[in-house]
Amino acid sequence: VDLWGMNVYRWDNPENIFKQWSALSDKPMYLSEAGSDSYMTVANHEFSKGENEKAQAHSLNNILDDVFEYRSINSGVLVFSFTDELWKAGNPNIQDVGGWAPASSGVPYDGTANEEYWGILGVDRDKKEAFYVLKGFYNKKN
């Protein structure tokens, strides 16, 4: 194995995975999946219940801060996911709340992975606030 990829969901703070990895191995690693959804099942951490792009953008900003801060350990990140996915829960023709992994402790900020709301683009390919966060990181880091 030349490179390890890990799907890591540690709220909006993956920092300790990089520290843990560096203590375990000198092989390179990257986050093969990280992100958050744009639906708040409950109001929490000053984010309102319902569709909430601000919560998703805020958590992605925090995740990317850590990713770029630990570049000596971490080779990068694949943000999950590019677009919202209608087929993940309930009716495949409408965007539903819910899906797999309710009460997932690693999902910001409500602990619930609303599977159809993880995209940085909406179902109609409209750019969410998280898209601009990601774009901004790569524009300022290059």
What function would you assign to each model-found segment?
Residues V1-E69:
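Extracellular glycoside hydrolase catalytic/binding regions
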Residues F80-N142:
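Aromatic-rich peripheral "rim/lid" segments of glycoside hydrolase catalytic domains that contact
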Residues K27-S38, S75, F80-N93:
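Short, solvent-exposed beta-strand-terminating loops
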Residues Q20, I73, Y109-T112:
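Residue-level signal for the start and early helices of compact helical domains
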Residues A57-R71, F80-E85, I94-V97:
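C-terminal structured "cap/appendage" subdomains that terminate the fold
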